[in-house]
Amino acid sequence: MATNFFIQPITEEAETYYPPSVITNKRQDLGVDVYCCSDLVLQPGLNIVRLHIKVACEHRGKKCGFKIMARSSMCTHERLLILANSIGLIDPGYVGELMLKIINLGDTPVQIWAKECLVQLVAQGDHVPDHINILKRNQIFPLFAPTPRGEGRFGSTGEAGIMRT
């Protein structure tokens, strides 16, 4: 079976950039580009960026985690932007909106335009996705059903993970 991403816009704004469709990864790209859904100004220092989407990934029919990684366009001669945690690791049980912590290392604000891609999604195990499935905004979808992990963001479990006693 295949590796597939499922992207669901959660705002009307995001629907503009993510119309319902199934995209076949003919080029066999490892990363799936993710759009910014609105114009943003990133101030020097730490910024929280909403992506206005939920994302799930499955490999061989089983839900799996994925990584959020910077694209090369994130850091250029004109702008010095990095992900605060280098790589965002998304648990298989997370069903909330994707958000980014981006640090603007420069001294001046940086303009980001809607439909600009700063990050990409990479399946756990670095499996090449076969399909990217864009769902309707209010579509009920089993991979987004409530889980014990839930919608809490940025390490919100407050626990040390599976090694707790």
Swiss-Prot record:
GO terms for cellular component: host cell cytoplasm; virion component. Its cofactor is Mg(2+). The keyword Hydrolase applies. GO terms for molecular function: dUTP diphosphatase activity; metal ion binding. InterPro entries: dUTPase-like, dUTPase-like_sf, dUTPase_trimeric. One of its GO terms (biological process) is nucleotide metabolic process. It catalyses: dUTP + H2O = dUMP + diphosphate + H(+). The keyword DNA-binding does not apply. CDD domains: trimeric_dUTPase. It is found in: Host cytoplasm; Virion. Keywords: Host cytoplasm, Hydrolase, Magnesium, Metal-binding, Nucleotide metabolism, Virion. Induction: Expressed in the early phase of the viral replicative cycle. Signal peptide: none annotated. Its EC number is 3.6.1.23. Homotrimer. Belongs to the dUTPase family. The viral dUTPase may play a role in lowering the dUTP concentration in natural infections to minimize misincorporation of deoxyuridine into the viral DNA and ensure the fidelity of genome replication. This is Deoxyuridine 5'-triphosphate nucleotidohydrolase. It comes from African swine fever virus (isolate Pig/Kenya/KEN-50/1950).
